[in-house]
């Protein structure tokens, strides 16, 4: 059984006593490569991801090359199994359509496909063309289909992450590209890239082919890109904790669900303040913030919580203070008892 299939069998719901004991959905979180990046050894970082409550993680190309040259992918799989990680995402591959720098591209593709086979990876992520002018998407179609077939051969799905500064700059356009290609292709819907690319909840709901939606990543952000910062720089250093920015993430989540998306929810957060924290603390904060936003999306349209009582609460024995006799000043006592006499 593949990793994600096992997790789907194990997933359930927990009771919520504050709302009459009704079920509250348990959500799988996936830490993207930036979210759990650090200088610690891979084994320690994987353990930190699992301890923070994540069920999945994304491995970057640098990590894959390092593991292949040192411990090997079989040992990495044991680390993931021991930590209980069940969703594994690999990438991100670039220039997969290009005939230039073939040696580097072939090396990256080879390490990703080898890792996907050994790790029973869920997905392989690729990006579009960042060059100016970008390659016409039609020229990329054949390479996309070929890579999608290669990913299928090792049991993973190929997913495209559209970025606003690429030749497939909107999720709607990227979805059309994916839908026209190999059925093993999919779309990664990233909150920052989608909203900064000009998409709205309505355009996503109407313009994304439901069958293409394969992954979702959550982060929060400011209302506008800060002055002096490019979109790419904001994407790298301005990804705030879910719920701490200006975006309607519960609405974004409901839009993705309306297209049929279920689990897991990628968490891609990266700011100077988060990077300054110990990795385990940063991961715990990121997981808690994301779960709060998902819970808010779950609660949309649900019956309101019971009203708080309006009558005064009775005084409990713990709060009860025993009456104390009044304190009488010494001068008053002397007047009452008269002057002291000596023997």
What positions do the PLM features span?
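Conserved, mostly hydrophobic/aromatic
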Residues: 49, 57, 80, 116, ...
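Short, acidic/polar
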Residues: 38-49, 103-115, 198-206, 249
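Boundary/entry segment of secreted carbohydrate-active catalytic domains
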Residues: 24-40
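C-terminal helical cap(s) of enzyme catalytic domains, especially alpha/beta-barrels
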Residues: 277-299
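Acidic/histidine-rich catalytic cores of soluble enzymes
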Residues: 8-10, 28, 57, 90, ...
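Structural motif corresponding to the early beta-alpha repeats
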Residues: 26, 55, 59-142, 193, ...
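Active-site acidic/histidine proton-transfer and metal-coordination neighborhood
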Residues: 10, 15, 47, 81-82, ...
């Amino acid at each position: 059984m593949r990793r994600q299939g096992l997790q789907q069998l194990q997933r359930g719901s927990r009771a919520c006593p504050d709302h009459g004991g009704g079920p509250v959905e348990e959500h799988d979180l996936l830490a993207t490569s930036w979210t759990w990046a650090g200088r610690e050894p891979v084994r320690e970082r994987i353990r930190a991801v699992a301890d923070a409550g994540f069920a999945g993680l994304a491995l970057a190309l640098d990590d894959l090359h390092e593991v292949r040259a040192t411990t090997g992918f079989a040992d990495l799989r044991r680390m993931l199994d021991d930590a209980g990680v069940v969703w594994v995402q690999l990438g991100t591959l670039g220039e997969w359509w290009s005939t230039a720098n073939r040696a580097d591209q072939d090396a990256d593709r080879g390490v990703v496909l080898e890792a996907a086979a050994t790790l029973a990876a869920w997905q392989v992520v690729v990006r579009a063309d960042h060059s100016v002018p970008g390659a016409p998407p039609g020229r990329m179609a054949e390479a996309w289909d070929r890579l999608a077939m290669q990913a299928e051969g090792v049991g993973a799905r190929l997913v495209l992450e559209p970025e606003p500064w690429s030749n497939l700059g909107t999720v709607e356009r990227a979805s059309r590209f994916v839908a026209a290609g190999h059925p093993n292709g999919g779309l990664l819907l990233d909150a920052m890239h989608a909203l900064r690319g000009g998409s709205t909840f309505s355009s996503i709901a109407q313009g994304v082919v439901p069958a293409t939606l394969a992954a979702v990543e959550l982060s929060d952000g400011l209302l506008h890109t800060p002055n002096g910062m490019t979109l790419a720089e904001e994407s790298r250093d301005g990804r705030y904790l879910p719920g701490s920015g200006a975006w309607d993430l519960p609405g974004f989540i409901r839009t993705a669900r309306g297209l049929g998306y279920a689990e897991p929810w990628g968490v891609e957060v990266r700011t100077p303040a988060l990077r300054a924290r110990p990795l385990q603390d940063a991961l715990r904060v990121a997981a808690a913030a994301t779960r709060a936003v998902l819970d808010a999306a779950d609660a949309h349209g649900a019956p309101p919580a019971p009203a708080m009582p309006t009558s005064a609460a009775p005084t409990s024995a713990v709060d009860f203070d025993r009456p104390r006799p009044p304190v009488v000043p010494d001068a008053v006592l002397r007047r009452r008892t008269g002057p002291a006499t000596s023997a």
